[in-house]
Amino acid sequence: MSIGLVGRKVGMTRIFTENGASVPVTVLEMSNNRVTQVRTPENDGYSAVQVAYGSRRNSRVNKSEAGHYAKAGVDAGELLREFRVAADVAAQYQPGAAVSVEVFQAGQKVDVTGVTQGKGFAGTIKRHNFKSQRASHGNSRSHNVPGSIGMAQDPGRVFPGKRMSGHMGAVSCTKQNLEVVRVDAERGLVLLKGAVPGSKGGHVVVRPAVKGGA
């Protein structure tokens, strides 16, 4: 399995296949990925490649981070991510090396992780797809309430994990087995079939699919 890349969601559009079918795609900008560290079983107990994305002013980087980037010989990034790989794959990379979007190929399946769009405080119907209660026939002012949230004196508490009203969205989410439709190495763009989590401009992490094959 190859390493993944970090990028930014540009937005959605569509492209047309040779037979005229319309395919909705999400455009990801994934240029300027560079290796900051290579983990080895001898030094770290596992094999991995650490990648930085984007740029950050030196005044916004603390001393430990600045030293980490300086050791790798790369500019400070806005995001660091680590990808577990086999030892022979990790040996192919050196700190400071650039990583191109060509690690992905058209037709490949990938997993995409991002932070979902925040929806603010939401009730149980919108947040958990609860059903509304009766509109009339004995129901008064209890149309959209969740109903009972527990039992009586025993156990005398609400169980953890009970689905209730609360903040909706703004959580990490992974969509699996999205197809790579096109790779534009010149502009550092990757086009994926369908939607990915997050708002326009949000960070995303793209890895080879762990379940869906090549």
Curated annotation (Swiss-Prot):
One Gene Ontology cellular component: cytosolic large ribosomal subunit
Superkingdom assignment: Bacteria
Subunit structure: Part of the 50S ribosomal subunit. Forms a cluster with proteins L14 and L19.
Region (Disordered): 131-153
Task performed by this protein: One of the primary rRNA binding proteins, it binds directly near the 3'-end of the 23S rRNA, where it nucleates assembly of the 50S subunit.
InterPro entries on file: Ribosomal_uL3, Ribosomal_uL3_bac/org-type, Ribosomal_uL3_CS, Transl_B-barrel_sf
GO biological process annotation, one example: translation
Keywords, in A-Z order: Methylation, Ribonucleoprotein, Ribosomal protein, RNA-binding, rRNA-binding
Protein name: Large ribosomal subunit protein uL3
Residues found modified as N5-methylglutamine: 153
GO molecular function ontology, one term from the record: rRNA binding
Keyword Iron assigned: no
Compositional bias per record (Polar residues), positions renumbered to this chain: 132-145
Pfam families referenced in this protein's UniProt entry, alphabetically: Ribosomal_L3 (PF00297)
Post-translational events: Methylated by PrmB.
Entry's family note: Belongs to the universal ribosomal protein uL3 family.
